[in-house]
C-alpha cells in the first residue's frame, strides 16, 4: 500500500487546485518524502528478518487495497478528504501489523510500526483540523 500511496501523493501534489494549493502542495511533498523513507525502512526490516519486500509496481498494485487516482485536477477539499480516508486506512493497517508482529514475538517490528502509528494519528488529527 505504501508504494501506491507514494505515487498517489505525487498525483495529489501535481493536480491539487484551489485556494489551499500552496499549503497542500508543500504538505504533499513532505508526505511523499516521508512515505519514501517509510518504504525504505520497511523494505530493509523485511530483508533483515528474511522476507522479501515488494519492489515493482505491478505487484504493488495487485496487492494494494488503496485506490489510485486518475491524472486530473482535484480540489483542495477533495484532496484533504481523500487524504483523511487514506490515513484512516493506514492507521487500521498499521495497527494490524503491530498486532501480527506482537503475536510473532517480533518486538522490533512492532516498535517500528508503533512509531508510524503515532505519526499517522497525528497527521489524521491535523488533516481533520484543517477542514473544520
Protein language model regions, located:
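A structural signal for well-ordered alpha-helices, especially hydrophobic packing surfaces
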Residues: 6, 13, 32, 39, ...
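Conserved alpha-helical segments that form or flank metal/cofactor-binding pockets of metalloenzymes
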Residues: 22-59
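Long, contiguous binding/interaction regions
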Residues: 16, 21, 33, 53-61, ...
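Acidic/histidine-rich alpha-helical segments that form the ligand environment
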Residues: 40, 44, 61-114
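Helix-loop segments that flank and shape redox-cofactor active sites
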Residues: 5-31, 93, 97-108
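Short alpha-helix boundary/capping motifs
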Residues: 30, 56, 63-74, 126-130
Amino acid at each position: 500500500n505504501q508504494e501506491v500511496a507514494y505515487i498517489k501523493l505525487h498525483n495529489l501534489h501535481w493536480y491539487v487546485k484551489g485556494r489551499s494549493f500552496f499549503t497542500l502542495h508543500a504538505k504533499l511533498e513532505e508526505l511523499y518524502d516521508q512515505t519514501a523513507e517509510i518504504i525504505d525502512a520497511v523494505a530493509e526490516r523485511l530483508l533483515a528478518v528474511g522476507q522479501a519486500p515488494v519492489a515493482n509496481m505491478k505487484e504493488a498494485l495487485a496487492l494494494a487495497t488503496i485506490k489510485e487516482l486518475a491524472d486530473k485536477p482535484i480540489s483542495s477539499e477533495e484532496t484533504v478528504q481523500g487524504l483523511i480516508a487514506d490515513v484512516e486506512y493506514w492507521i487500521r493497517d498499521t495497527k494490524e501489523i503491530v498486532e501480527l508482529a506482537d503475536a510473532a514475538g517480533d518486538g522490533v517490528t512492532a516498535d517500528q510500526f508503533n512509531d508510524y502509528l503515532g505519526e499517522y494519528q497525528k497527521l489524521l488529527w491535523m488533516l481533520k483540523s484543517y477542514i473544520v
